[in-house]
């Protein structure tokens, strides 16, 4: 029996690695996918072999993650429940893809992961595996074998598995960092400063603001302060720049896929800055009808990704609309980073629908104001008539005008 295990090197997956050998007599192949987490990958590989893995794969997928996943999220202004930029959720389909590739290569019929039965990741992993490799058996030991934290820690001590004294559970990649556990489970308590690594507090942020200019092509960031660069590099640089100004801290109540409400704390400096800049450029370059409808599409796209439905055909259909709309989203946006805020202060585009000659109140305006009166009459006609009907309001002037018109016809 060969099993491919998504391996982080943490307590859960290290305990699972040993247990699958003991309980099932399995040969376990471990896979670690690098999506930008700040881990010691050499130590993770050492641990994998130490605890019995017959083979270990380290896969650097950072650039693929940026170009094929984060890119889509930016174009979709992806914020689940208007807050969470989907950092963890976006990475799961890519990790699943790599697990399936290894399983097929190694002839393994079982894919295992360390997800609990309470979180969203079990949905994302299981649905993804079933979509890409329907014949695979999915093993979820923490949930299926009802492993508790206390039991795992006791087992780890007996088998020489290092037990971290960290209070918080961390998941990170280039797009964001999520923090769970400890006092954060009480939503009434402010997150202590110790939980944050990517961002400084507002109190410690510089008093002087910093300005960044982000260039977009077809809705995708392609330059920072006039320098062309790949999306991965741009995100990493912006995480550092925006983070030092306290931008990107998120603390909100989130509805999980399994029906639980949870308090979630994130750091996402680049994500917050880029999405804000992108949305502003859309306002400059898209019609109000496209913007209005796209907000619905974006929200649904975010919901699908959050809930593990990456392989749902609706996602691709929504992306068809998004990609068409984004053809016009080209230009530059200047953002002021200051004391936890990312404030758009300037934008320009060759595709701008803003015309200063139309918008100005100065004498060189080209807008014919006389047209407004007739427009207003037509625009609000049904609303005014409905109000009058419901409230018994009748215009005698209108009646007189109608009578005069009838006489003219006679």
Swiss-Prot record:
Pathway(s) it belongs to: Amino-acid biosynthesis; L-arginine biosynthesis; L-arginine from L-ornithine and carbamoyl phosphate: step 2/3
Organism domain of life: Archaea
GO biological process terms on file: argininosuccinate metabolic process; L-arginine biosynthetic process; urea cycle
This protein's record includes keyword NAD: no
Binding residues annotated for L-citrulline, in chain numbering: 84, 120, 124, 169, 178, 254, 266
PANTHER family: ARGININOSUCCINATE SYNTHASE
The protein, known as: Argininosuccinate synthase
Encoding gene, per UniProt annotation: argG
């Amino acid at each position: 029996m060969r099993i491919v295990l998504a391996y982080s090197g943490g307590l859960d997956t290290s305990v699972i690695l040993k247990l699958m050998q003991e309980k099932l007599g399995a040969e376990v192949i471990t896979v670690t996918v690098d999506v930008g987490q700040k881990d010691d990958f050499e130590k993770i590989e050492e641990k994998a072999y130490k605890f019995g893995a017959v083979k270990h794969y380290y896969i650097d997928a950072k650039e693929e993650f940026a170009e094929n996943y984060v890119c889509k999220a930016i174009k979709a202004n992806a914020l689940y429940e208007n807050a969470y930029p989907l950092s963890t959720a976006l990475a799961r389909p890519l990790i699943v893809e790599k697990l399936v590739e290894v399983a097929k290569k190694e002839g393994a019929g079982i894919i295992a992961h360390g997800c609990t039965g309470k979180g969203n990741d079990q949905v994302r992993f299981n649905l993804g595996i079933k979509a890409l490799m329907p014949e695979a058996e999915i093993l979820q030991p923490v949930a299926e074998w009802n492993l508790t934290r206390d039991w795992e820690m006791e087992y780890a001590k007996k088998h020489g598995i290092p037990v971290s004294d960290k209070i918080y559970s961390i998941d990170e990649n280039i797009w964001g960092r999520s923090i769970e556990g400890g006092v954060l489970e009480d939503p009434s308590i402010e997150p202590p400063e110790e939980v944050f690594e990517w961002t400084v507090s507002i109190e410690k942020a510089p008093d002087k603001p910093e300005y960044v200019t982000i260039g977009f092509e077809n809705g995708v960031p392609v330059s920072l302060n006039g320098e062309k660069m790949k999306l991965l590099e741009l995100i990493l640089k912006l995480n550092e720049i925006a983070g030092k100004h306290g931008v990107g801290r998120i603390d909100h109540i989130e509805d999980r896929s399994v029906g639980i409400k949870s308090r979630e704390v994130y750091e996402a400096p680049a994500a917050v800055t880029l999405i804000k800049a992108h949305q502003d450029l859309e306002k400059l370059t898209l019609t109000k009808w496209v913007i209005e409808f796209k907000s619905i599409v974006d929200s649904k796209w975010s919901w699908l990704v959050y809930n593990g439905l990456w392989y749902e055909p609706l996602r691709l259909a929504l992306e068809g609309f998004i990609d068409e709309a984004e053809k016009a989203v080209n230009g530059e946006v200047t953002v002021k980073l200051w004391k936890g805020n990312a404030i758009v202060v300037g934008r320009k585009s060759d595709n701008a629908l803003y015309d200063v000659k139309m918008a100005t109140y100065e004498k060189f305006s080209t807008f014919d104001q006389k047209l407004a009166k007739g427009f207003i009459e037509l625009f609000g006609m049904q609303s005014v008539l409905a109000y009058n009907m419901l409230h018994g309001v009748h215009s005698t002037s209108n009646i007189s005008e109608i009578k005069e018109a009838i006489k003219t016809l006679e």
